[in-house]
Regions:
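N-terminal helix-turn-helix DNA-binding core of bacterial DNA-binding proteins
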Residues: 1-41, 61-70, 99-101
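Generic recognition of well-ordered alpha-helical segments
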Residues: 3, 32, 44, 80-83, ...
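Amphipathic alpha-helical dimerization/coiled-coil segments
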Residues: 18, 70-101
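Short amphipathic alpha-helical/adjacent loop interface patches that line ligand
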Residues: 24, 34, 46, 75, ...
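Basic amphipathic alpha-helical segments that dock to polyanions
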Residues: 42, 46-49
Length: 101
């Protein structure tokens, strides 16, 4: 459990994985998809995910060099967990809404 949380825990990593599961993305597209994340934090989170082999960084061979981030094959193995967390979150919101009524 500790190793899993170290690799994909925190406020932003699962959200990054969610958006990359949809399709590879440029840095700016990821940042737009996640209001509230700073450039510094997104950079740090992507570096950690790359270091763990979960995300690939693919610089294109033009100048200025646009970089595309994508899930690695290993990173795709996390997608069932990402989907389960997403579904649990929807259920949790519904339970809280019912409780507040």
């Amino acid at each position: 459990m500790t190793a899993a949380l170290a690799a994909i825990g925190g406020k932003w990593k699962l959200i990054i994985l969610y958006w990359l599961a949809e399709s590879p993305k440029h840095f700016a597209a990821l940042q737009r998809a996640m209001p509230g994340i700073s450039q510094k934090v997104l950079t740090q989170q992507l570096r950690e995910l790359m270091s763990d082999g979960i995300v690939n960084r693919d610089p294109k061979g033009v100048v200025p060099a646009p970089v595309v981030y994508s899930l690695s094959e290993y990173g795709r193995s996390v997608l069932p967990l990402v989907e389960n967390v997403r579904l649990w979150g929807r259920t949790h919101l519904a339970v809280r809404a019912d409780k507040d009524r």
